[in-house]
Amino acid sequence: MVDDKEKNMKCLTFFLMLPETVKNRSKKGSKKANSSGGGGGGGSVGSGSSKLPPVCYEIITLKTKKKKKMAADIFPRKKPANSSSTTVQQQHQHNLCNNNLIPAPNWQGLYPTIRERNAVMFNNDLMADVHFVVGPPGGTQRLPGHKYVLAVGSSVFHAMFYGELAEDKDEIRIPDVEPAAFLAMLKYIYCDEIDLAADTVLATLYAAKKYIVPHLARACVNFLETSLSAKNACVLLSQSCLFEEPDLTQRCWEVIDAQAELALKSEGFCDIDFQTLESILRRETLNAKEIVVFEAALNWAEVECQRQDLALSIENKRKVLGKALYLIRIPTMALDDFANGAAQSGVLTLNETNDIFLWYTASKKPELQFVSKARKGLVPQRCHRFQSCAYRSNQWRYRGRCDSIQFAVDKRVFIAGFGLYGSSCGSAEYSAKIELKRQGVVLGQNLSKYFSDGSSNTFPVWFEYPVQIEPDTFYTASVVLDGNELSYFGQEGMTEVQCGKVTVQFQCSSDSTNGTGVQGGQIPELIFYA
């Protein structure tokens, strides 16, 4: 009987530790035992083949297992047997989105893993022991938090809640972080999920940096690098310097250098700070005409006047530009660009205008405050895909048909144009329409003419602006040539070419209707910046 009492005490102890539903189950089990044994339960114990109540048996059995299993192994996720359980989970998700309490009393049973149960607490008032008022005045949002979870995910939160200087506040104001960005950070901390959007990624990066969540910050930088283009490169350059992200800064410079005119004409250029403006104007490798640089600086000055609540006058534009004006290499402009543009802008003083005109025309040139040395720009690289070229009496003829080839690179480059063969019958002029597509979408095209001298050399034909090419994706390069003379054509084509640090792969294109393929034909060269 002593043994019976000890076992009963163990069972009662476990009953106190188990949820209410298990208690009910145990009560049913004990009733069945009593009904089967009548009043002689003690005799069965004494026989040596005693049976424990069902709950106790299950507990002891689990304790004797040596191999530990994760919750997901013990309770594998299954599809709901009926629509009611699905409705419960949908309602639960609805409550999460609306920052409400969980209505289900036993919600823990719906989520088999600790990760899923932890995620339930995201943006949930249930058991919240701190609240954040996030956002600037007039645009705040009150968000719940759980100190333990936050401290595990961020050393800043750990110091805030459990450090030596921890403050016991129920509500914390964070005016310098956008609510959407703060929620994105909380979602990562609670759910181990990264949810980024183009319009909030910079704010999320700021939050991740502020609260030292390095993996989220790295994901933000990767997102920005992937979405980097001439339209946003200048803004991202400014932000990358602010966040001290040198890799992102380098990627921004690569885009700005190669697609300088597009970057300078973008709306984002006008949103940069003065320090970034100076950095761009100093840039030796900008691939842009100086008149474009000058016009971009004036556009920036106009927006800066608005930011400073200054009248849009010539004097104020020059005032906000300050010494940055002299970083524009006005003496290196074409004379027509200067005479019809900068000289008539009103930004230059009369003496400056006269001195620059003398710089163009006089043998004894005056001293100028402006930099008079032209920018170096970028040197284009050429990827030649044929090992030899030839001509025959009946090839290569053009009658408005398309020559096309597909290519892919292993790092981001900027296609500036194509190198094309010329006439094999002496000097001749060709009309060329070049085009670059990705999955049927035209990324760049240009119609121009080029003159060939009868040699087997290639002759460059340029796009209006370099086209950004992403790695590991096939693009289609096409050209339609119109000319009366037969031309040279390539032979012994290569499927892969190493050009500096860039590997280029080639494959045939279904757009080609004039015979060009990997082994031979036209488009012998890709001209690009890397």
Curated annotation (Swiss-Prot):
Q: Name one Pfam family in it.
A: BTB
GO CC list? cytosol; nucleus
Q: In which tissues is it expressed?
A: In the somatosensory cortex, specifically expressed in spiny stellate neurons during barrel formation. Also expressed in the olfactory bulb, piriform cortex and hippocampus.
- InterPro entries this protein is in? BACK (IPR011705), BTB/POZ_dom (IPR000210), PHR (IPR012983), PHR_sf (IPR038648), SKP1/BTB/POZ_sf (IPR011333)
Question: What PROSITE patterns does the database record attribute to this sequence?
Answer: BTB
Where, subcellularly, is it found? Cytoplasm, Cytosol; Nucleus
BACK domain location is 243-308
Q: Where is the composition biased (Gly residues)?
A: 36-46
Biological process terms from the Gene Ontology for this record are: cerebral cortex development; dendrite morphogenesis
Give residue ranges for domain BTB: 128-198
Q: Gene3D superfamilies attached here?
A: 1.25.40.420, PHR domain (2.60.120.820), Potassium Channel Kv1.1, Chain A (3.30.710.10)
Q: What does this protein do?
A: Acts as a key regulator of dendritic field orientation during development of sensory cortex. Also directs dendrites toward active axon terminals when ectopically expressed.
What name does the UniProt record give this protein?
A: BTB/POZ domain-containing protein 3
Q: Which organism is it from?
A: Mus musculus (Mouse)
Q: List the lineage, top down.
A: Eukaryota, Metazoa, Chordata, Craniata, Vertebrata
Q: Which gene encodes it?
A: Btbd3
